[in-house]
């Protein structure tokens, strides 16, 4: 079985991958995340996920039997990607734009080894209730929005804004587990390895 590496600094992706019982090692993979002109959100997240996986693979010894996972998430409103907020004003503008509306969250996950690569893209729809400006300001002071695509974390304090979700909850958090498990299986890496040897 190949060794699995996760090319991501996201603690949320580490937690999700741990949740499905897959051992892995974290790698640092820095790539340029600037969107191309006229690039669709789906093409953008797929390119970044694959780029992270390939960048991670490139730092490993060539003789090592390894598989590297990369992932990327984008929050999309009216066809526009909402990245991580640069400051408080940006975060508040994002939250007020999302207020009372439905938006899309696209997450791509990619796996690659020395012979091949494969990707999955999962699109979910999230609807926010109306958000008051004082709520958005209070949420900013929590520190939670600063490093999150779209300026919010569905698994955190922003859960109270969510009226509904269609799609993959784990995908919105940062790693769609159903599709991730399918990809891992194609590369010979089973989930639930934590259960091996437990015959009781």
Swiss-Prot record:
Q: Taking the first listed entry, what is the main subcellular location of this protein, grouped into a coarse class?
A: cytoplasm
Q: Does the keyword Cytoplasm apply?
A: yes
Biological process terms in GO annotation: nucleotide metabolic process
Q: Which Pfam families match?
A: Maf (PF02545)
Top EC class per UniProt?
Answer: hydrolase
Please indicate which superkingdom the organism of origin belongs to.
Answer: Bacteria
One GO molecular function term of this record is: dTTP diphosphatase activity
State whether keyword Hydrolase applies: yes
Instruction: Write down any Gene Ontology CC term.
Output: cytoplasm
- Residues the record marks as active site: 72
Q: Which UniProt keywords apply?
A: Cytoplasm, Hydrolase, Nucleotide metabolism
Family to which the UniProt record says this protein belongs: Belongs to the Maf family. YhdE subfamily.
Query: What is this protein identified as?
Result: dTTP/UTP pyrophosphatase
Q: Which organism is it from?
A: Pseudomonas syringae pv. syringae (strain B728a)
Q: Print the organism lineage.
A: Bacteria, Pseudomonadati, Pseudomonadota, Gammaproteobacteria, Pseudomonadales
């Amino acid at each position: 079985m190949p060794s699995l590496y996760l090319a991501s600094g996201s603690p949320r992706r580490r937690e999700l991958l741990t949740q499905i019982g897959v051992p892995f090692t974290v790698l640092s993979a820095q790539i340029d995340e600037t969107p191309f002109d006229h690039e669709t959100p789906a093409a953008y997240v797929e390119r970044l996920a694959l780029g992270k996986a390939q960048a991670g693979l490139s730092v490993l010894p060539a003789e090592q039997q390894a598989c590297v996972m990369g992932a990327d998430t984008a929050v999309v409103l009216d066809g526009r990607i909402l990245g991580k907020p640069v400051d408080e004003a940006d975060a508040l503008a994002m939250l007020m734009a999302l207020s009372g509306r439905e938006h899309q969250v696209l997450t791509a996950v990619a796996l690659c080894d020395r012979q091949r690569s494969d990707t999955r893209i999962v699109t979910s729809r999230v609807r926010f209730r109306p958000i008051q400006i004082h709520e958005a300001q209070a949420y900013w002071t929590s520190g939670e929005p600063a490093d999150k695509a779209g300026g919010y974390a569905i698994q955190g304090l922003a859960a109270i804004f969510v009226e509904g979700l269609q799609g993959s909850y784990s995908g919105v958090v940062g790693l769609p587990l159903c599709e991730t498990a399918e990809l891992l299986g194609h590369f010979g890496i089973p989930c639930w390895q934590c259960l091996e040897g437990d015959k009781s």
